[in-house]
Amino acid sequence: VVPAEEVRPFLIGFKTMKELITALAALDEARVAVWHVSFGSGRFLRLNEEAAGLTTTAWQGPALLLAPLQSEATAVEQFISARLAALGGEVLPTPQAQHAWEERYYPMRLKRLGPSLIPSESVIPLSGLEAALEELTATFGELAMEGALIKGQHVAIQSFALGDERLPLHFALDFTKSLQVMDIAFKHGGFPYSLGMFFTALAPSKFGEGLYQELKNVKHALDPSDLFNPDKSLASKNRTLAVAMSAARLGRPLAEATAAVLPKIRQGERPLPPGLADDAFACVQCGYCRPVCSLYAGRGWESATPRGKFYFLREYAHGNIDFDQAEVDTFLMCTTCKRCNPECQVSIPIQEDFDQMRGFLVMEKEFATYPAFYMMKAATRAEHNIWAELREHRADWVPEDITYKDAGPLAYWAGCTASYVIPDIAQNAFRIFKEGGLEFAYMGTDENCCGAPMFMSGRWDAFEEIVRYNIDQFQKRGIKTLMVSCPGCWVFLNHYHRDWAKKLGLEYDVEVRHVSEVIADLIGGNRLQFKRLPDRRATWHDPCHIGRHGGIYEQPRQVLQSLPGLELVEMTHNREHGLCCGSVLTRIKEPVPTSDRIATLRLDEAAAAGADLIYTTCPCCEFQFRVAGDSIGHPMRTIDFTNAVVEALGYEGRDTTQASLDIWVVFDKVIKQMSVEGIAQMMRDLMPEMLANMPEFMNKSMGVMKSLPEGMRETMLGAMRPLIPKMMPAMMPGIMPKVLPDILRYMEEQIPGIPPAMRQLMPQLLPVVMDDMMPKMLPHVLPLVVDDIIKGMADSLKGANKVQ
């Protein structure tokens, strides 16, 4: 243990491993103070950089990594110049050294290139290292290998061979190479890095007979039944494993010959989106992603984690399991928080992979998306917003004293939620721009949705339409820079629109800036003059979509810290480690308990930080914290940060919490009504109307049955029961238009307080929603109502007018 101090890494390249080993000996002899000493073969270094997505270095030979403490770096630098250069060492560029240092604990990154690895670990005396490496090179060619110096006398060697477990026979045969590497290490005085289950027979020689017996005695005294780590490290009663190890060694020559002629056939692999199968098999199942997974925090099930999903995809690719709607729902519920990406030991682009699954599952595999998204899709196509509001009212929020242009290089994007639900976000932005002297454009009623709900829901057909429309509008209006309040809009206009523009062959060169960046610039240019606010202590919640997706962490903090009277305190998890709010996907799919649990973690953190309120900038985060707080009775308030800015500018801020709660009451009822259970209950309640509008052939059949004796009717109805789930999907397209007025009346009865615009649009939107949704919903709904249908038919035959 030493006092905390930064290190300064040096990477020294050599032409041959022999030169590098000589340098190691010189380093030991000179007793130079170096905190960390390791090395890698040329192949290891190149593969490591390739796995990280870096441009592979031109250096082909092995390299030595020296990482002294900063206070001792000058002496090490002098040693490199005086001694190692004379031995053929060449100092490689600093960025390459920094990468090698930062990646020193992540050799498993190579697995992405496999997507499987065959590792071998051993410890070799420094005196025998040269001969051992020469034999390894003669046997295998250039190995991907790294080593670390242990007390100057031994070197821990870890070698890697790339493999592919999707070729099971090849993979099994290739694994014998790891034993061959180990045997060469033993030959030159080495021993296993760890014993585990495979090398327990070597325990006496590794520990020494005296220590070995002492360890066995202690283990037996503490664990007489050998319950803990049985058959590991000290002794093994597993004779089968010992026999298998011997057989593997004896059969190695045959394995090598077999592998050379065996065709490489992947068994039963089913297609996945590009790159996803490789990533699923590259996942090492380490579980580092699990503690940071937002969905896991709310659900508590392994299936919610990236590790669980990659395991499922691996089994799916093998043909051992298939998707069902429940599993699809789990994939779609990923919050896109991106907390897992930096934790992945293999650098898998997890969030981007699960993005690809959305379109794959909904568009290609034709599973249902969440019911709410069907209404959003219909509303967006009809009125350019997800809230089923009228397009003509999109700009009603604009303050009367603010003027703007219809076109120009600098423009503002409000987004659907700020335009219709919590307008303080957009109104504040306009007032700040005015005070800062900005001239800008706003598209008004021509502004569309950013497309986030369509992309997240897997409805990529609708998302493509939105991308094309938006880019066309930007070009027509000469927009070069777009100022955006909503982080969801920011990431979709900045990242996803850019990616899709390339796919669609569209030109898209618009710079997208978050309003916090714009306000920070105005403050930095002394263009905003603030008054003192009433004293308050606030914390900042980092929205995922401008944080981990965009790296915008400091600008909103700079804005808040510039406001007199406001004390900013940090939550335990902040910036790149900030917790996700859980919205929107968990809120519309599993509001209780999943979504509430995720939000509670953040609300509790804010309270623990001593904050009076949370400031943030995301309408979805604000909506989530407000609704969850109301659900669980949490007192923490959440306010858009621009309210603090306009207050300091002399305007009155607004708390739109109640507006969020009011719209959620309606939206929650709509979601429940459109769920499988909600549709089933609607069919039960409207059974007389549905039966009265059956196709003609069913009416004739019912007429025939009505003339039969009661016993025969019951027999025929019983025979029809298994046919109903097969017949109804074909009959529903004819029934639905006839009962639409009844459905509209029913919806208004079940959803009191429905906004006037939504009520006005329902006759237009509902048929579209039902046509889109019902074919995918009916297979799940009909098993719940088949008994009700049979009972309704029986009552109808008896002349009943109403289904009880």
Please name every model-derived segment.
Residues V1-A4, Y193-L195, N448-C449, C580-C581:
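FAD-binding core of FAD-dependent oxidoreductases
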Residues V2, R8, F14-Q180, I184, ...:
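C-terminal substrate-recognition/cap domain of FAD-linked oxidoreductases
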Residues F199-P263:
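Activity-critical C-terminal alpha-helical subdomain
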Residues A247-G275, A304-Q325, E554-L563, K589-D596:
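Short, charged low-complexity linear segments at domain edges
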Residues A277-A280, A304, F310-A501, E507, ...:
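Iron-sulfur-cluster electron-transfer modules
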Residues S347, T417-V510, H545-S562, E567-S675:
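Cofactor-cradling patches in redox/metallo enzymes
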